[in-house]
């Protein structure tokens, strides 16, 4: 922005808005109008014109640079500050809080000018903060009134009051702003439309009687939306929501399309199936038996209704309508379904399967019409209660149809739903980027302003210059801005006098220098920027550590922290000028919630954001928000003596005051010498936080320095002027809260300090926390007296310990400093709560206080980085999500009220439709709380069941609309935004371990000390033993030096120095989990000896290592830099002998056998040594010479074995065997006993397999040697599995096969398929990726478990023992409280009458373990209802539950779902995605889920441009055929066929199950027409394309469909009976629509999505394969354990573990965690009376139908975790990844489609695919292309300017043309050359024929000749051209007369242009594409010029040809 434009900031920039100012504006407008020529007036809003300043927008706060507003200027019209409005009629008004409001200066309502007192008053009221508060309160009160379900009469008056207030508000707004004509008037703000409609509706409903009032009353709910317009942060979030919804449009279209296709398939497959029921037949009454045969003959023809011929008594219709004749399972509302195919559900004896009655679930679940099918599929896609649909459909149609569900779930559900996620995340990311960019731009603008400020103030500073000389000197050297005041001493911002400032500074200076002298001379050495760069930037180099936070950690250590941010929840709404970057980052910045010691300043942005000033303000004053935060960017390391003292005043502003401070032992300063230049440089190259340009660019460095000084100045003034607390408070604090009165006390204090601050104490406290948690987790029901007394004593002890710790810490630290630290406040809070709880222990109803003890668990976060990170992430997200949560709350509130108003009455009136006893069900909308619960349940994704109820009572349309809106708005958008926020706060930095702080490392220091001690003892013992027994061997001496190094290194590791070496090393964890970067063989990064020494000499030096490898701005590492993987291994071992590599990611290992034969051919035939060197060294016998004798024989044997094992066939054979043996396992189901032959075959096969595998193992041992075999994880797996088979074989042979242990071993055979893993490359890749993720998944899993532990213990406290109830076990009903009130009454019943039973709910909260299981069911929303009902009904221990007695227990579950389920499960997704991204970086950005082959496919997909021109199908010579050919190849023909396909689909959609005969006939004929049309298309194509027709895949497909359709017309009945109905194939035709998409420009987004799907397929296939393997193993395992459990709940005749197929069907269902509770329930039956342990199973020897609860729980939980969390989330990761890649691809200016289009056009010009085109055709060709490659005619000039190389015959190669055109689109750049080389390579690869393509490049000599020839030609030609040009231009001059001024210049340009072409380097002849400007002015008539060009080109062609000869 030009400087003249800027209003000078500062208080004097405000001017009153007067009539003069209005006149001035009018004058400016008039002047501008006059200036502007007429034609320009149209495009006033030019995009590049000036824009309003975004900081001065209405609603924003006034930037602090303007200073305070003079009091008389508050709330009155002022002139507009924004230069943009200088000629617009506007003015601004500022209120006390400095919020800007902008008004139009035109008269409001044509009456009130800005100077009218009425309008002035209205404005004053409008901008006043109280007015806003009043409106806010009104809205909230109004919301409370709206929640009343039947309000009392007096509420009517309250309603009037509300309406009155709203009307008043609108009137004020209209008076102040005007109504709607100008900008900034009332109706110009969309939020005001809302107000307007609300008020209008209020009056309309009041005065006009409109019938259905309740529907209109629901509009009042919109008032709740007004909160959004009142609270500032909410508008932005709503903006973001709306943005993401816009972005979703493509996905939505795609989703609807896919769903329609699937729904059509469903309609065709299952139409009417779900009405099949089991009908009792024959009927009971014997009189019906007459004439049954005749009945059958005619009842089952047609529709089975015609039977009344013989017996009139029997009415078939009535019979099948009567529900009592159907077979019902107990407790079910719907009759049992069945099917007529062999694998469908069968009816019990005495029943037949008949289609009758209505569909299940009130008739709403069906595939009978398209709309119901669509609903069913939508439900499938959102995975809500889909197991029910799945079971019904399979039961009615047959198990084979599982395939349909697999497709829909994997393609529809996983893919589409995750696409929505991906789109939302991307939209969010983009918005974030935009905010960041805007912030940077602002920063630049304000820098300008500041410089201006500085200029204005320079004069005033001259006086102060002398005084500040010293300090400037100092600030130059040490570079710290805090004490410097280079420029604005006498700043206008300050109200202080100069003198005061100077004095203050002098005092500071003296204090400073007393301790400074000795260091200062070192610091002052040089003022050069270099020293700043070296010392100064030390701070940001350090990575995530604020340099001076801990370096002198005095008791006041934490004052420089950001604790303040904890107290300012709304800080972003008023961040100040200088923290722009920070403001955008807030959402994800880690530090908002970082506690002091761990505030890791993660990245420059957040570091800059929150340096000194804790953002904590009393009220809305913001000039102090963070001036310093920008300075912090340049803050160099503090003065080297840590004599710093700082205090925080009440306002949270830090003042740095010099003064002696006691250093604690932990905070010793770094010895100067340690940080050598090399180290810093090294660290700079590897730490990726530093912004290099900041360091390198001198101007920005200077600017930064100057800014720092300006700011620090302002800082100091602010500190003084801002001390809000009266001084007496400080006095009080110093007197009472800092205890250092007398010497002896100080000694005591020192002692206490030594003890309390010792790491071991910390360790002890941590152990206490863990023990305390354990004690709390040990509570259970029923507990013995003794046990509970032990627990309570334990609790007292722990409370005592924690209290003591707190008091000792207070003594050691003084209360003032103790409470400066977050953790201490937290401790204090918990301790006081525990004490309070002890006091109130016996008060009834306060037992909940006990659950506060659980918060102690969070103290672990102090020493557990991941937990800390999780809490921070949740904290941050809650900050950013605060607004989002509010929006969500508003949405939930609105829908809850809407539901209550619309449907509440219907639930009451029609209740009998949905419940048998006419009582309101638990889920209803009659009152607000239940309505809220329903809406919440919909947000959890469970909408279908509540919607059925609603539709049944209140009508289908209303319910569908409301529920769909909640579903789409709430569920999809908000929850996804939630996820996006979580993912964004999950940058890899956060995962970087934050263990770089003293306090935090205390634990590890303690552990380190112990480790050291143990190592010392070990070493002594080892030395002793060596002295005593072992002769010293030379070999040992060799190892010694290395070991020494390790020991030294050990000592430094145990000191918790984390070594930072480079970015891409393997980070391993040593024993105690400290991450230390261990160098790989990348030479650049390996630490050299001197560095080691510096680490060792100075143990307190801490350098941090990010675990996650970040992307570096400094160098793009090429993969070449990594040496081979085995080197990595070696260096790992060298550097880290002590560390166990548990953290190492993917099993990089030595390359697996036979993987890289081509790399080391000489090695691949030689086996390696059998034993490790150590073995050989210790046991000499292992070493044999292989040169002669036995040794040689042995060596030859090994070589032979090696050849065998390495042979491909061997591997194939083994894989085949593995598959066979796995397959054999699938036969061992419950029917094996009856099939004797199979059983014996399997037994023999089993032996054979075992022998084969043992042989394989022996061969491998001989071939590879033990060392290789047993160091490979996959080999271990083989080894263990073979062992299992061996053991069971021997046991069988010895006759021990019936032993329990052996039986359980047999089940381990299920693991056999795992061996296939290492053999299939694809799966192995996925498994490796997974293994890499395991450490972090485990970490998060642990954290989640801790998190859940809290809820579990709370659950035990609340519900233990309260779920027991008394039931009548014959009917299964619970007794009413009036009958049975408690356990003793139930007992009495049992004694008198046997049918009662006191029973517990199976899944309960009786102990912590069961609590976890219950919570898992709640978190997966499966089986959660029963648990919730039990909890809500519970009363107390041994009391009979009562319906909804404990209603608000629902809230426990709601809270758990929000924190335990949404957060933690999404966190998993976050971790997994994050992890894969890191691993991708590690593997050089390649996709880790794909094998090499698949990568090739992937790359081919990405670059379809590798197409070469194909021979087009030649046009037939025959005239008639030719015409048809032309017709068929036109686009119109294609599109019309597409339209026909769509119409055909529509007719298929119209079909319904119960359509009339007439309708069926009509559809038949329509279908016939379509078949004729499609046959016609087929015939026409056959005629015109001849045999080429079959070269195109689509055509073959069409042909097959047509044939099938024709056959189907005639043989429809027959085919349908034996095969699938042919209509299905028509559906597949829809896929042809994909072809249209290319023709539609608007469909680009959808094509991107499909492209992403195509790209994901290989990886998804691998993951699917792995999932199948897991399912296979679990299915085998399930068959062997749960085949005989009792059939109840989820296990029945079709869904069970009896056979392999059934197990797979069940497991597929649980993959999405659907219905696992039902399958688990029967397995939890452990004994009578739930099941019968002695039940016989005919045909097998097994007894009993009880399950094994522990095995069952393990089975299901592990399967859910593996499949749901891991595999499904990997799916998500792949899709997100590919989606972003695809979006990037589609954003490029030239996409694959453009290249494809180029080749399509090319085919027409080059029919024989010669790859050349004649120069003459070029112009037409260029014109025929589509944009962006199109060069429209006239294009000769441009084409010539491209200077394309030609070969003989004036032909040009297609690549040259494509390349030149591409260059024209993309412009010249380095990338172009890369692209060109790539394209040429690709072309050569795809054209082995290599047509003589290289017209220019031959040998070097030829090249030189050519170059010289060309130079000569060009020189001559240039001479000719000059002549011509001169001639022409002279003619031109004569013609044009006076207008010739420009020509000479143009002539020069032309000559230059040609010059460019003649430089020898440019022989590739591709100069710039634009035509020389001179041509137009020089032109002779077009034709001549054309001929000249042509002849020139011909000359050139000849020249080249000659030179070639």
UniProtKB/Swiss-Prot annotation:
Residues 917-918 are annotated as: Binds SCN2B. Gene3D superfamilies: 1.10.287.70, EF-hand, iswi atpase, Voltage-gated potassium channels. Chain C. Changing residue 12 to N: Found in a patient with autism spectrum disorder; likely pathogenic; decreased voltage-gated sodium channel activity; faster channel inactivation; loss of function. It holds the Pfam family Ion_trans. I repeats lie at residues 111-456. Changing residue 1823 to A: Found in a patient with schizofrenia; uncertain significance. Changing residue 908 to E: In BFIS3; increased voltage-gated sodium channel activity; gain of function. Residues 149-155, 209-214, 271-369, 395-401, 779-789, 844-845, 899-927, 949-961, 1228-1240, 1293-1300, 1357-1408, 1431-1447, 1551-1561, 1611-1623, 1678-1699, 1723-1752 are extracellular. May be ubiquitinated by NEDD4L; which would promote its endocytosis. Phosphorylation at Ser-1506 by PKC in a highly conserved cytoplasmic loop slows inactivation of the sodium channel and reduces peak sodium currents. Changing residue 928 to C: In DEE11; mild form with ataxia. IV repeats lie at residues 1513-1811. Changing residue 322 to N: Found in a patient with Dravet syndrome; uncertain significance. It is found in: Cell membrane. Changing residue 212 to D: In DEE11; the disease progresses to West syndrome. Changing residue 1641 to N: In BFIS3; uncertain significance. Disulfide bonds join 278-338, 912-918, 950-959, 1366-1386, 1731-1746. Changing residue 976 to K: Found in a patient with autism; uncertain significance. Changing residue 1211 to K: In DEE11; markedly altered channel voltage-dependence; responds to modified Atkins diet. GO terms for molecular function: calmodulin binding; voltage-gated sodium channel activity. Residues 1905-1934 form the IQ domain. Changing residue 1128 to T: Found in a patient with acute encephalitis with refractory and repetitive partial seizures; uncertain significance. Belongs to the sodium channel (TC 1.A.1.10) family. Nav1.2/SCN2A subfamily. This is Sodium channel protein type 2 subunit alpha. It comes from Homo sapiens. The gene is SCN2A.
